[in-house]
């Protein structure tokens, strides 16, 4: 039992979105805390970046880059902020975030609510230039298009030009189910055109580009995405976003529209990771996301082909100490397997 498990019933009396906002405000008071020292057996160099451990904070938690250093201070090896769009947008009508407690899951239909590129740029510039929150650490930026955009590819190109100078890496998010038509950019022709625009917009900058994908894909889609990603020399694929499918759920909010994350996504996300590992032949690094809540979950995802992992929904149920527990557990798994580096375990199942 952890201190968080004692507090959780009280926290869950607050609706999900206001509780999240209170959490961000509380973490803002902790900005500048101590980061977790690199763990030699867990450290990896991927896409030219030195990850101190493979456990990352998924986007959606810190949408506006308000608390990246506080999250690094919780033990994360990297943090991904966003999704950020060119212009501020309110997102979908509330309520739009639901805890499914009996299923240890979350349904969201947030709709890329964020303060926009200018606000996030200001925070990242301040972080870099003032040193006030200038802790070392990998902070990626997840970029998206405005819902009412007349040219979504142009939005991604603009976001690339704005964020590439400030981000450790960029993630092109075309897999949210909560922006109508967005997932169509995963189609072969649209994806190639999008990535060409992003790469052109990046210009001479070397910021790695990741691509975040949906779990609700057909085998032919997976093959074409891998081919294009390798051809365009993307740095990594993130598998996966939330799902619009609905396994058997017990919670009262099970029928809510939106993307499902947490424990019910685990098997689907794991299978899609394996599918992408097979289709890519290991030619591109993979980031495993979806339903990871325990050390065994994390280790399984690594052995299935993920070089890195990300968590979010599990934090709702397990609390802020989860990242450090996963890091300690993965270090133990590497040692028990007789390995010197977690990189040796990637894809070893």
From Swiss-Prot:
FMN binds at residues 59-63, 83, 142, 173, 212, 240, 262, 291, 312-313. Its main location: membrane. Binds 1 FMN per subunit. Substrate binds at residues 63, 108-112, 173, 178, 241-242. It is found in: Cell membrane. The keyword Oxidoreductase applies. Pfam families: DHO_dh. Gene3D superfamilies: Aldolase class I. One of its GO terms (biological process) is 'de novo' pyrimidine nucleobase biosynthetic process. The keyword Cell membrane applies. Its cofactor is FMN. Pathway: Pyrimidine metabolism; UMP biosynthesis via de novo pathway; orotate from (S)-dihydroorotate (quinone route): step 1/1. Its EC number is 1.3.5.2. GO terms for molecular function: dihydroorotate dehydrogenase (quinone) activity. It is a peripheral membrane protein. It catalyses: (S)-dihydroorotate + a quinone = orotate + a quinol. Keywords: Cell membrane, Flavoprotein, FMN, Membrane, Oxidoreductase, Pyrimidine biosynthesis. GO terms for cellular component: cytoplasm; plasma membrane. Monomer. Catalyzes the conversion of dihydroorotate to orotate with quinone as electron acceptor. Belongs to the dihydroorotate dehydrogenase family. Type 2 subfamily. This is Dihydroorotate dehydrogenase (quinone). It comes from Novosphingobium aromaticivorans (strain ATCC 700278 / DSM 12444 / CCUG 56034 / CIP 105152 / NBRC 16084 / F199). The gene is pyrD.
């Amino acid at each position: 039992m952890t201190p968080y498990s004692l507090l959780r019933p009280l926290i869950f009396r607050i609706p999900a979105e206001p509780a999240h906002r209170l959490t961000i405000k509380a973490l803002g008071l902790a900005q500048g805390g101590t980061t977790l020292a690199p763990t030699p057996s867990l450290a990896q160099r991927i896409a030219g970046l030195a990850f101190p451990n493979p456990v990352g904070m998924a986007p959606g938690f810190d949408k506006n880059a308000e608390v990246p250093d506080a999250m690094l201070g919780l033990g994360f090896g990297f943090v991904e902020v966003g999704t950020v769009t060119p212009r501020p947008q309110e997102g979908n009508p509330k309520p739009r975030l639901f805890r499914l407690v009996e299923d240890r899951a979350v349904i969201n239909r947030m709709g890329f609510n964020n303060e926009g590129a200018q606000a996030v740029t200001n925070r990242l510039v301040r972080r870099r230039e003032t040193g006030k929150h200038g802790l070392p650490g990998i902070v990626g930026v997840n970029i998206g298009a405005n819902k009412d955009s007349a040219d979504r590819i142009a939005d991604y190109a603009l976001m690339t030009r704005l964020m590439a100078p400030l981000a450790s890496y960029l993630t092109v998010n075309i897999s949210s189910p909560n922006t109508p038509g967005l997932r169509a950019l995963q189609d072969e022709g649209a994806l190639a055109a999008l990535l060409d625009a992003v790469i052109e917009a990046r210009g001479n900058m070397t910021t790695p580009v990741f691509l975040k994908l949906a779990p609700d894909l057909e085998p032919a889609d997976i093959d074409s995405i891998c081919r294009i990603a390798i051809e365009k020399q993307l740095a990594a694929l993130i598998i996966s976003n939330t799902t619009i499918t609905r396994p058997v759920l017990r919670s009262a909010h099970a029928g809510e529209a939106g993307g499902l994350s947490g424990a019910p996504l685990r098997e689907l996300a794991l299978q899609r990771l394996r599918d992408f590992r097979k289709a890519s032949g290991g030619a591109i690094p993979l980031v495993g996301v979806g339903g990871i809540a325990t050390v065994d979950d994390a280790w399984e995802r690594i052995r299935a082909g993920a070089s890195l992992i990300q968590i979010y929904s599990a934090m709702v149920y397990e609390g802020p100490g989860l990242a450090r527990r996963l890091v300690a557990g993965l270090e133990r798994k590497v040692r028990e397997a007789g390995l010197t580096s977690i990189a040796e375990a990637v894809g070893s199942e």
